[in-house]
Amino acid sequence: MANIYKSAAELIGNTPLLEVTNIERDLGLKARVLVKLEYFNPAGSVKDRIAKAMIEDAEAKGLLGEGSTIIEPTSGNTGIGLAAIAAAKGYRIILTMPETMSVERRNILKAYGAELVLTEGSQGMKGAIAKAAKLALEIPNSFIPGQFVNPANPAIHRATTGPEIWRDTDGKVDIFIAGVGTGGTLTGVGEYLKSQNPNIKIVALEPEGSPVLSEGRSGAHKIQGIGAGFVPEVLNTKVYSEVFRAANEDAFAAAKLLARKEGVSVGISSGAALHGAIELAKRPENAGKTIVALLPDSGDRYYSTALFTE
């Protein structure tokens, strides 16, 4: 039977779960650690899911149509996902981002035909958000998906990512850990898993250098894609029962460990999530449990960063 897709948008989701058996063995872990490899999405990250969801939600509501321009403040992956879907659907897209984002990310965005507007690095995502809002006022027939506030973000994870994890583990998942950028992944997956089994523990991951969720203060860090410096609107703060803080060095080390032990190259925030999962697996009370960590993207977006240059 033929199995042919008609659009890149149809290729999103159903990403694989990998048990890191070599790491489990070498570290003597008593728990199972599974990683969900979101770089298998067509534009290379978990953000493909929300890009498709936000665009199709806007189309259904009549907010996007022929001749529309999509504008979004993004630290990278959401922009790449949006640029890919915009290309597939024929929309103009303008992305605002801090100048501190990696060169690879910028070049990928340009490859998909996106227009980039770089903002002051010291202002972080807040500066990019303000610039996007200004552009939206100036450009007619424009639409800002607004990943930090758009309910279509957590909704797509409730509808796809969460059910995939439940299905692929045959319902045998005890702990789920994911980084908080917009909070959409943790919220959607967490709510779905909790609806299936209220005893599943959900762990929010944030950078040690910007402990907004655990301590209410923001700061500088090197874990691109998480730790936006504020509590995002779409984050359900009641869904998680623990906040795990990852240091820059631990995120880098875990990403390198995965490449060298399992042959899987992932990005910095993925390293942070894996580090969190490994530390959870070391706890005596978690022996025999199954821990799932969501790894947002691959290492090839970070060759110019400290992940590979140090």
Residue spans of the language-model regions?
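PLP-dependent amino-acid enzyme catalytic core
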Residues: 1-310
